[in-house]
Amino acid sequence: IARRYATERWIGGYDLLNEPVLFNGGSQVRNLQRRMRNRIRKYDLNHTLFVNGNMWSRAFEGMGPALDQNMIWAFHYYSWMVFNRVNQSTIQYLINFRNLTNRPLWLGEAGENSNEWFMEVTNLMEKNDIGWAWWNYKKIGTITGPVSSPSDSVYQQITKYWNGDGARPTTEIAQLGLNNMVENLKLEHCE
């Protein structure tokens, strides 16, 4: 990937490993991500590396020092991770880590609760000079994102089956439902 995209200006960077979970600590995650960095840097010195913490991108013990001068510590912030509280104490350890390693922070995912919750999270991030992105930008039939695509009854048959609440759809129904979902995800059909 790095060899192919090294000179592409429209590439923002590489998210090395999304939500790693190694119960023996961050040093194992760090070692794996260091090997990934070394491979990428053989071909690409231009693009930023997004380095996620351990335990679903929340724990940074054993992750320092910084792996690269052109890197950002990436973390996730979901309500279950912070007991549905949005306040300074839930991110202070990240700010301390940022200051210790002299590398910026990036909130790569924040969980779908409510628009009010999102507002509190983005305000907290901006108050602390932390970059952030919507996760997820586009969802099916919800208000917890900037863009919502419509759902339809055929696609809902599939999701009911996946959730154990409905009969297994035929191959034809499954294909039609997934095709409908893809069509509905086009921006011209979204709210």
Residue ranges and their predicted role:
Residues 3-130, 134, 144-156:
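Extracellular glycoside hydrolase catalytic/binding regions
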Residues 123-124, 128-191:
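Extended, alpha-helix-rich binding/interface surfaces that flank or overlap catalytic cores
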